[in-house]
């Protein structure tokens, strides 16, 4: 094309892309056209409200004011301009700032809350209202990594006339990453194992701390949701949509914590540089992540269950919504790749490792906490979660959700759980709890007996995991919404 332009497309698609055409011989960029699909504004506005609404009083009502929307458009276009210049995503960037720094208003004013606009780090959901962050600094901007990477890619090198002559200088510049961590890029071949390279994260140097702060803001957003979306004479469709997006944000943040389990810290190094590319995350950090999920994800998040909202959008459905959200977290913890990494960590790190058996025992204690009570009583939300757990185990023992080499783990865990249920049954006087536990014990017996085990059911979270791991330019702006019918990606 003769001109490189920003195109605004009349489309309901919630996305934007920045493709370019380049000469494969030289790398010269010949043409680029940023494509802004109209409904990317709906997506980005919803993210701003859900992630940073409690930090900006002017964002308490939807739609957002024009000047805030203008800042959001600037952010989206700048990210896509990066692609047109040849920059790939850098999911490592946001984890290079300590979590406390993204709450420091002086730091954020100077450095932003992420070093790179090419990260999938959206609006600052970690900062708290009392931190006093300037609302103008809640939106990502071109950061120190972007400036440094632009110089590395485009700054002339006097005297160099060939790529080979440029190489020593470029390598010297690249080594600045060793002293300045926010110049670092994603590690090659990390394969999703580094929680510092997760998407849609802020302050993910410590995902547990960041998510703990994030859910405080989500509780505030839930109180804002009804007045923000209510319009005289209109239905509650927008309220239902935003509530599903809030649950999606909650799910993403919990998945950030799940990424710590079986994870590694990675740092790109080449020949001649000391140190390892991959270092196992210490067992104490992994165990802390599971404890957090037991307390925050598997214990019912009461702030997400607001009758004033729920009775305006549907006659029933909250049990299914929360089950879908919690199921995605549980399934993420039990993926074959994660369990395999933990198995290899046990082999390589020995007693220092957080082992697969440790994970399963901690999950059992967190999901079936009531079994240890003097008089067990399990409510409907927790029965839903525990049934989800049994189905996940069934899919691993009798289905294709785990390789045969892992099956013994899940069979042993079900036997332990069956014993705990048997010991708890005489102590409960609550009829629903008794009936549920009796049924759960029978389910376990059928799962473990190949003569009676029914076919395993497909996991809703398998396609979710694949979609969330996609980080190509075509998926820069991907929303996760939790509905009563399942998980929607758009």
Language model features: what each stretch is:
Residues 1, 90, 119:
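Structured DNA-binding interfaces in DNA transaction proteins
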Residues 1-84, 109-113, 123-126, 284, ...:
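Metzincin-family zinc-dependent endopeptidase catalytic domain
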Residues 5-12, 91-96, 279:
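Short linear motifs at secondary-structure transitions and domain/linker junctions
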Residues 40, 44, 92-95, 99:
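Alpha-helix termini
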Residues 81-97:
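Catalytic Zn2+-binding segment of zinc metalloproteases
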Residues 94-490:
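Conserved catalytic/binding loops enriched for acidic/polar residues
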């Amino acid at each position: 094309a003769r001109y490189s332009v920003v195109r605004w497309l009349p489309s309901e698609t919630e996305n934007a892309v920045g493709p370019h055409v380049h000469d494969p011989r030289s790398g010269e960029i010949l043409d680029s056209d940023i494509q802004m699909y109209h409904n990317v504004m709906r997506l980005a506005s919803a993210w701003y409200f859900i992630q940073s609404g409690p930090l900006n009083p002017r964002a308490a009502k939807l739609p957002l004011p024009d000047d805030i929307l203008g800042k959001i458009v600037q952010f989206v276009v700048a990210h896509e301009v990066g692609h047109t210049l040849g920059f790939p995503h850098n999911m490592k960037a946001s984890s290079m700032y300590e979590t406390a720094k993204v709450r420091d208003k002086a730091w954020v004013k100077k450095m932003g809350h992420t070093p790179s606009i090419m990260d999938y780090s959206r609006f600052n959901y970690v900062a708290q209202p009392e931190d006093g962050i300037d609302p103008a600094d809640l939106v990502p901007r071109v950061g120190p990594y972007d400036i440094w990477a632009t110089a590395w890619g485009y700054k002339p090198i006097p005297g160099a006339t060939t790529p080979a002559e440029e190489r020593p200088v470029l390598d010297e510049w690249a080594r600045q990453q060793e002293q300045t961590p926010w110049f670092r890029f994603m590690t090659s071949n990390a394969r999703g194992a580094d929680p510092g390279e997760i998407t849609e994260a802020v302050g993910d140097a410590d995902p547990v701390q960041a998510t703990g702060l994030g859910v405080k803001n989500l509780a505030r957003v839930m109180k804002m949701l009804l007045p923000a979306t209510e319009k005289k004479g209109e239905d509650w469709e927008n309220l239902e949509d935003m509530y599903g997006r809030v649950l999606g944000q909650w799910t993403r943040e919990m998945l950030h914590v799940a990424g710590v389990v079986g994870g590694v810290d990675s740092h790109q190094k080449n020949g001649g540089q000391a140190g390892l590319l991959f270092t196992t995350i210490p067992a104490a950090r992994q165990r802390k992540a599971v404890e957090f999920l037991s307390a925050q994800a598997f214990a019912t998040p009461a702030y997400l269950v607001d009758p004033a909202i729920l009775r305006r959008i549907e006659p029933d459905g909250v049990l299914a919504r929360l089950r879908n959200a919690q199921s995605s977290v549980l399934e993420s913890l039990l993926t074959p790749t994660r369990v395999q990494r933990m198995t290899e960590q046990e082999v390589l790190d020995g007693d220092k490792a957080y082992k697969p058996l440790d994970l399963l025992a901690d999950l059992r204690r967190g999901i079936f906490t009531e079994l240890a009570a003097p008089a067990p009583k399990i409510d409907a939300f927790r029965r839903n979660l525990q049934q989800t757990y049994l189905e996940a185990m069934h899919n691993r023992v009798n289905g294709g959700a785990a390789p045969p080499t892992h099956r013994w783990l899940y069979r042993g865990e079900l036997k332990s759980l069956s014993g705990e249920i048997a010991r708890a049954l005489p102590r409960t006087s609550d009829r629903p709890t008794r009936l549920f536990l009796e049924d759960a014990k029978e389910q376990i017996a059928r799962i473990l007996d190949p003569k009676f085990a029914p076919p395993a059911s497909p996991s809703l979270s398998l396609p979710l995991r694949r979609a969330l791991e996609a980080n190509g330019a075509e998926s820069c702006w991907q929303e996760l919404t939790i509905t009563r019918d399942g998980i929607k990606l758009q």
